[in-house]
Amino acid sequence: MIYESIKNINFFTNKNNYNHIFNKSNYYFFNSNNTVASNEINQKTIRVVFSRPCWGV
């Protein structure tokens, strides 16, 4: 699953002038309002919108 495959990868995104850099040990998703939602939230309601994946950084 995508949720498992990205959990140890750094991601950052530029949505609405935000510039978030996330820790390797955590992974986050953005819901329809572009707010950070953790994996604990029901994944069926989360739309994953990473604008720039940084592989191996």
Swiss-Prot record:
Q: Report the domain of life of the source organism.
A: Eukaryota
Name-wise, this protein is Putative uncharacterized protein DDB_G0290003
Species, as recorded: Dictyostelium discoideum
